[in-house]
């Protein structure tokens, strides 16, 4: 049954929490959350139901509770105009039973900082220190980035707490935004310095850029860490044409 069986509030206003109950004892067996998002797809924005909170009490696993939640929720998703649903599966085979399929792949780029030879940048870099000073620039970059890739979630203002609460000195996470000489935002990166088996590295949790100039600006920033760091690592969508962004691939 829905979280409130007497009020099927449209998903656009509230998350929807579904639960399955044991018919004899009335005990809650399983839960599924469906949260409202907007995603980019082929130039348009569409409603997407994000699946989360999938859980069953151990004694009720494999008892059909999750299946029952999906059987009730999916028709309402259709009725409310949802085009997509998205989740991180604990089992690909299990969720294929409900029509889910793998749709997102990405690269993990690992670049040797000593090999970076970016052109000198005529722009500037700004370090986030909390507050919303960089919020307009980073939101602009996110909107451009999201428009390039299918299934990218359109970020709301509430999604930027990581930026508003930036504290590089205490958290040791560094968020830099790159700007052109004219003051246009080119890219940004959020990273930590981590000791790993292959060296002391810059490990990015977020990296966005606009065009070749944006990528070059971030590489210019990273190259300044080459004296005491070995690699920079960052995730990218698999369709990003890395071979055109890096001028030299040979390390011979």
Regions found by a protein language model. Give the residues of each.
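Conserved acetyl-CoA-binding loop-helix of GNAT-fold acetyltransferases
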Residues: 51-56, 61-78, 211-223
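Flexible glycine-/small-residue-enriched beta->alpha junction loops
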Residues: 102-119
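Conserved active-site alpha-helix within GNAT-family acetyltransferase domains
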Residues: 78-83, 89-107, 239-252
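A short, polar/charged loop-to-alpha-helix boundary motif
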Residues: 38-45, 111, 196-203
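Active-site rim helix/loop that mediates acceptor-substrate recognition in acyltransferases
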Residues: 1-41, 150-175
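Intrinsically disordered, low-complexity, positively biased terminal segments
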Residues: 120-252
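Conserved GNAT acetyl-CoA-binding A-motif
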Residues: 70, 75-89, 227-238
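Conserved beta-strand in the GNAT
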Residues: 19, 26-37, 50, 55, ...
């Amino acid at each position: 049954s829905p979280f409130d069986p007497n009020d099927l509030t449209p998903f656009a206003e509230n998350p929807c929490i579904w639960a399955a109950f044991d018919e004899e004892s009335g005990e809650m067996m399983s839960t599924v959350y469906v949260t409202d998002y907007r995603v980019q797809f082929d130039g348009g924005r569409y409603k997407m139901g994000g699946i989360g909170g999938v859980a069953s009490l151990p004694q009720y696993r494999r008892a059909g509770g999750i299946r029952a939640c999906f059987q009730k929720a999916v028709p309402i998703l259709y009725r409310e105009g949802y085009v997509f649903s998205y989740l991180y599966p604990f089992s690909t085979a299990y969720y294929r039973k409900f029509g889910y399929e793998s749709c997102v792949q990405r690269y993990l780029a690992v670049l040797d900082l000593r090999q970076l030879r970016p052109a000198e940048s005529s722009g500037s870099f700004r370090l986030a220190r909390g507050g919303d000073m960089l919020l307009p620039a980073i939101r602009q970059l996110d909107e451009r980035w999201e428009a390039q890739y299918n299934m990218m979630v359109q970020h709301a203002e509430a999604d930027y707490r990581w930026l508003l609460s930036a504290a590089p000195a205490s958290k040791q996470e560094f968020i830099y935004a790159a700007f052109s000489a004219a003051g246009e935002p080119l890219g940004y990166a959020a990273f930590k310095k981590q000791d790993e088996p292959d060296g002391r590295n810059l490990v990015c949790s977020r990296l966005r850029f606009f065009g070749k100039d944006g990528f070059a600006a971030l590489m210019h920033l990273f190259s300044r860490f080459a004296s005491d760091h070995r690699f920079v690592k960052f995730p990218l969508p698999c369709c990003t044409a890395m071979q055109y962004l890096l001028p030299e691939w040979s390390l011979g």
